[in-house]
């Protein structure tokens, strides 16, 4: 059966238009400009019908670039941008003056995994800004890589209970080590009790950075664990292109995602995880 697919995690960046500090000096294949046109053929062949662009740097230039790309794309229906969460007054102003009136602006993210303090989100100013997001029902993408990021997100959930959040890339489960399921699993069982949390099945082909020979059977237990505890209704998928190129191409990434989803959820839930849940979460 053919299902429509929403790719909730696509990146684009233009090194001529904005600075991406995390790429500077890198010898990675990621250290160049990436444009949506590069995946057009594979996207169509993979059956991806809609997408969400996700921020790749903590500045407004990146957000504005994504919005320009989305408007011209014909298939991107949402942007997860950036706001200066350390400045609640400016966050409120930008929302009121600009982004609440921008139909493509669907969520906010900050590169918390690049902050020295894993508790960055718990600063009073940031919590105030997150409360502003919650008041406007704008969701927040949690891009964590450590157990401490899960712990921090759970505190945020207690402090701002109406804030909807999604753990990007399942907050990096211990796929590379093969541990089942360690501290990640213990914390996710608790996080699942906060019904504002959702899980994004994405970036798992490169989880932990050790992706040589990574197979679907290596990843499957962690996706199964996620669905068991969060329920299929709180899960959706993303491709994480172009970061995913470190492991495989765009079409192969989506073949993997589909295989994982079809293995762990009932046939009646596949469409929800591949598209419907994402549409509901981001209001696409």
Give the ranges of each region predicted by the language model.
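Mid-to-C-terminal alpha-helical segments outside catalytic/metal-binding sites
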Residues: 2-6, 29-50, 225, 229-236, ...
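Soluble or luminal CAZymes and related metallo-dependent hydrolases
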Residues: 31-38, 58-62, 87-90, 125, ...
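Catalytic pocket-lining loop regions of alpha/beta-barrel enzymes
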Residues: 120-236
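Short, electropositive alpha-helical surface patch
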Residues: 61-77, 160-166, 219-228, 250-261
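Conserved, mostly hydrophobic/aromatic
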Residues: 9, 51, 66, 79, ...
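An N-terminally biased module of ancient metal coordination in phosphate/nucleic-acid-related enzymes
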Residues: 1-65, 70-71
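Active-site metal-binding loops of divalent metal-dependent hydrolases
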Residues: 10, 56, 83, 170, ...
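Active-site gating/metal-coordination segments in enzymes
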Residues: 61-148, 154-155, 203-204, 211-213
């Amino acid at each position: 059966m053919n299902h429509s697919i929403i790719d909730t995690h696509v990146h684009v960046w233009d090194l001529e238009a904005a600075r991406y500090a995390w790429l500077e000096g890198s010898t990675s294949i990621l250290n160049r400009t990436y444009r949506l046109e590069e995946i057009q053929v594979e996207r169509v062949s993979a059956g991806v019908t809609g997408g969400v662009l996700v921020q790749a740097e903590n500045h407004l230039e990146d957000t504005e670039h994504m919005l320009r790309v989305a408007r011209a794309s014909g298939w991107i229906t949402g942007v997860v941008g950036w706001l200066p969460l350390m400045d609640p007054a400016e966050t409120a102003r930008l929302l009121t003056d600009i982004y609440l009136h921008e139909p493509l602006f669907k969520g906010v993210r900050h590169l918390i995994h690049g902050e020295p303090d894993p508790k960055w989100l718990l600063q009073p100013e940031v919590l105030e800004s997150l409360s502003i997001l919650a008041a406007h029902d704008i969701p927040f993408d949690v891009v964590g890589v450590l157990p401490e990021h899960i712990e921090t997100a759970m505190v945020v959930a207690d402090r701002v209970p109406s804030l909807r959040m999604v753990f990007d890339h399942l907050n990096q489960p211990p796929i590379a080590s093969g541990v089942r399921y360690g501290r990640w699993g213990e914390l996710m069982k608790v996080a699942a009790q906060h019904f504002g949390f959702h899980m994004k099945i994405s970036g798992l082909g490169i989880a932990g950075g050790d992706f040589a020979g990574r197979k679907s059977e290596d990843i499957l237990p962690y996706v199964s664990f996620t669905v068991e505890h969060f329920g299929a209704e709180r899960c959706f998928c993303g491709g994480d292109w172009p970061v995913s190129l470190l492991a495989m191409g765009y079409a192969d990434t989506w073949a993997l995602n589909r295989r994982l989803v079809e293995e762990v959820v009932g046939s009646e839930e596949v469409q929800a995880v591949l598209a419907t849940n994402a549409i509901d979460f981001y209001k696409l």
